[in-house]
Amino acid sequence: MAAVTAAAVSTSAAAAVTKASPSPAHCFLPCPPRTRAAHQRGLLLRAQVSTTDAAAVAAAPAKKEKISKKHDEGVVTNKYRPKEPYVGKCLLNTKITADDAPGETWHMVFSTEGEIPYREGQSIGVIADGVDKNGKPHKLRLYSIASSALGDFGDSKTVSLCVKRLVYTNDQGEIVKGVCSNFLCDLKPGSDVKITGPVGKEMLMPKDPNANIIMLATGTGIAPFRSFLWKMFFEKYDDYKFNGLAWLFLGVPTSSSLLYKEEFDKMKAKAPENFRVDYAVSREQTNAQGEKMYIQTRMAEYKEELWELLKKDHTYVYMCGLKGMEKGIDDIMVSLAAKDGIDWADYKKQLKKGEQWNVEVY
């Protein structure tokens, strides 16, 4: 499950203070008396310097304010913090993977009564009930929001998550359960849940309704893209109608692990010209060379088409999920860029600067 991380940076004010040199008015060394002519020359010199400075300021170009390409106007962050979280109610909690899937993933809906004004692409924090081994409250865990800003019920009063239950065996052979993921997956309707946020601006949707949006997800990294796609294809707005191309690549281990497939099938039937989806099922599929079908393997089948899209200034790439996917995708892009004499590392920096390459991996 991808999550937006936040870091607070503290800077010492003292480090920014520079000791000022004493002005001539405060100099106590004896100075020879100045003549009237010298005084006038001093005034003239100061006047010339002032005029030159003013001209330089006037000639300096005004700093251009950066205008974001994303829906960032009025975005709210950190309305609720760990010390004073919002307490919502679990309304729905459903397992969305088959019984034979390697691991459980749950879709859950919490009431917010409109008090958490999030946008598509943001995250919320959840604080599990109870205390840790030191007797302190559990730390929050961040989860990407899986619903549009209107919520699954369409009334802007709920928020949804897509959570995989974390269970693993450590080096000592002990079974370890992730505190927050198990707390969430075990929630019953009517239970309280402590929520913080919303947080994050990296994964906000583009403003342009004609944009090409390429979404790359593994597992529960699908969450923010479900929020995008609901807004694009399941909802109606007076000021937004998606007319571009939304292309989703989703990587999972087995077909029983595919998340929200029925929803995506409906979207594809509704808008075949605007929505494409390709799955990579690593334990069941292989490419022509017999290699396991990971997300980057599936993308390689369309690499020329993807590269041509990526060269357009209205194409945006969003990546969410396991960190390991990033290198495989970079490897594809390196060879494609090289054919055009482009250094991929430099080009990716330009894309990031232009908000066209957006990554949230863990």
From Swiss-Prot:
Q: Which organism is it from?
A: Oryza sativa subsp. japonica (Rice)
Residues given in the record as FAD binding sites: R141, L142, Y143, S144, C162, V163, K164, Y168, V179, C180, S181, T220
Could you identify this protein by its name?
Ferredoxin--NADP reductase, leaf isozyme 1, chloroplastic
Q: Which InterPro entries match?
A: FAD-bd_FR_type, Flavoprot_Pyr_Nucl_cyt_Rdtase, FNR, FNR_nucleotide-bd, FNR_plant_Cyanobacteria, OxRdtase_FAD/NAD-bd, Riboflavin_synthase-like_b-brl
Q: Name one GO biological process term.
A: electron transport chain
Question: What is the membrane topology here?
Answer: Peripheral membrane protein
Query: Could you say which cofactors this protein requires?
Result: FAD
Q: Which UniProt keywords apply?
A: Chloroplast, Disulfide bond, Electron transport, FAD, Flavoprotein, Membrane, NADP, Oxidoreductase, Phosphoprotein, Photosynthesis, Plastid, Thylakoid, Transit peptide, Transport
Q: Where in the cell is it found?
A: Plastid, Chloroplast stroma; Plastid, Chloroplast thylakoid membrane
UniProt's post-translational modification comment states: May form interchain disulfide bonds with LIR1.
Q: Which gene encodes it?
A: LFNR1
Q: Pathway, per Swiss-Prot/TrEMBL?
A: Energy metabolism; photosynthesis
Q: Which residues carry this modification: Phosphoserine?
A: S181
- Binding of NADP(+) occurs at S144, K164, T220, V252, P253, S282, R283, K292, G321, L322, E360
